[in-house]
Every structure is written in structure tokens, then in C-alpha cells.
Amino acid sequence: MLEIVLSNRFKKDLKLAKKRGLDLNLMDKVVSSLASCQELDEKSHDHPLSGNFEGFRECHILPDWLLIYRVDDEEVFLFLSRTGSHSDLF
């Protein structure tokens, strides 16, 4: 199981998600799957990012609720970078 590390920006994004009334249990399920190195469902559209987010991956919790994360090279940490809608993140 990977150790989960939250960025400061992710913590702010999480507060906004709570304020918007999003179901944080859905995020917990996705993060638990990632932390235990399980593959995500096809509907999550997990894929690598490029540009400013090169080295990171993105998955969909809901169609317009995304999670940007990175697994470190030694596969010890799961770094949660951002969460939010497409317009929030890009």
C-alpha cells in the first residue's frame, strides 16, 4: 500500500469539493484503489498528462470531477496534486 501525500493545493481543492456538496466517498474509493495499486475502472479514464503536468496522471471521479495524482518512481508514495472540474484545473 502506498503512503498518501496531499499537496497544499489539493487540500484547498478538497475544501471546495466539500462546499460544492460532492460525494467525497467516491473520491475515497478511487484514492484507496490507487493507494493499493489496483487498476481503476474503464469509466475513470485514467491517463498520463503532458505539459505542465508531465509525470502526473489524471482520472475521473465523476464526468466533470477530476483527480490529478502521481506515483513516485520508487512506488512508495501516492502524491495527490489537484482535484476539481475541468475548468478549475485547466
Annotate each PLM feature.
Residues 1-63, 72-78, 83, 87-90:
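Basic, Lys/Arg-enriched alpha-helical interface segments
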